[in-house]
Amino acid sequence: MKRIVLTGGGTAGHVTPNIALIAGLKEQGYEIHYIGSYEGIERELIEKLGIPYHGISSGKLRRYLDIKNFSDPFKVLKGYREAKKLLKNLDPNVVFSKGGFVAVPVVLAAKKRKIPAIIHESDMTPGLANRLCIPSAAKVCANFPETLNYLPKEKAVLTGTPIRKELFSGNKIKGLDFCGFTANIPVLLIVGGSTGALKVNEAVRNLLPTLLKRFQVIHLCGKGKVDPSFNKHKGYVQYEYIGAELNHLFAAADIVISRAGANAICELLALRKPNILIPLSAAASRGDQILNAESFEHQGYSYVIKEEVLSNETLLQAVNHVFDNQKSYIEAMKNSNQNDAVDKIIGLIEEVRLK
């Protein structure tokens, strides 16, 4: 039987693309195992799917001064030894890594055991963990065309990011019914992430009376960010977080306002939803969201507002522009080479396995 080890963790963004591959890998006859950290978020997400999970020690490799810099390298070395032992016992045909520091010892151990490893980079520029893994990888999957410039030409493949199948099964009527909306008024969906986006929430609420003249508004504002004083507005609903019904809300939405995390924007691309991206500022991140957003804007998929210039005026201008030009955004997304990532990556896994 064909066997594959998936790895990646530390954040949900390093796990959900792996989850998106699982159904396709099973269809191809793969026995799937997952290697992650002992207590990371990946353990909970993977075990509930019934996939065999194997924990290893994990340490973060920091580029700044921290007392843990003295202990974490030993955790990485321990994780490497544990990964080598696991790979010897599991004897997979291929390792697929979504990144995160737990993946580093797994990819290095795969190289040592002569098992081909494929790694995936979601952001425009490779993060530290993936940079450490690239020399040991057989292939490197990229999410953005620009990322190919940072990768060895003989290893780089533009695939996009795997998207969960259930997102494609949304029903517009179910989404409208869930929100108590009518079918004859367009819908604006705001996705602030699980923790919310304070500046985005403020801008939307400041502009709400104007937005409601043209749209019905679904506002996913993040944990603890619901403001009951806005419930009086007809055509406006707010939620901390939406789980199983998210696919229906996407189906109901005509346009979307979102942060610019790689997984989030690739979902918008796959669903062909015209969108406005408001990336995290460089001060609040390593700048990857800004680069992600600029790439999507350059390719004609998105309208971008830098957080520093976000205001009532810039947001209203963006919303009206994107809504009035929906067709051009959708057409650009249809022509993208970053779609069908699941099929492309599984094809690459098969190619590497057969070499």
Curated annotation (Swiss-Prot):
EC assignment: 2.4.1.227
GO CC, any one term: plasma membrane
Parts forming coiled coils: none
Record's catalysed reaction(s): di-trans,octa-cis-undecaprenyl diphospho-N-acetyl-alpha-D-muramoyl-L-alanyl-D-glutamyl-meso-2,6-diaminopimeloyl-D-alanyl-D-alanine + UDP-N-acetyl-alpha-D-glucosamine = di-trans,octa-cis-undecaprenyl diphospho-[N-acetyl-alpha-D-glucosaminyl-(1->4)]-N-acetyl-alpha-D-muramoyl-L-alanyl-D-glutamyl-meso-2,6-diaminopimeloyl-D-alanyl-D-alanine + UDP + H(+)
Location relative to the cell: Cell membrane
SUPFAM superfamilies: UDP-Glycosyltransferase/glycogen phosphorylase
GO biological process: carbohydrate metabolic process; cell division; cell wall organization; lipid glycosylation; peptidoglycan biosynthetic process; regulation of cell shape
Gene Ontology MF: a single term: undecaprenyldiphospho-muramoylpentapeptide beta-N-acetylglucosaminyltransferase activity
Database matches in NCBIfam families: murG, PRK12446.1
Protein family (similarity comment): Belongs to the glycosyltransferase 28 family. MurG subfamily.
Protein name: UDP-N-acetylglucosamine--N-acetylmuramyl-(pentapeptide) pyrophosphoryl-undecaprenol N-acetylglucosamine transferase
Gene: murG
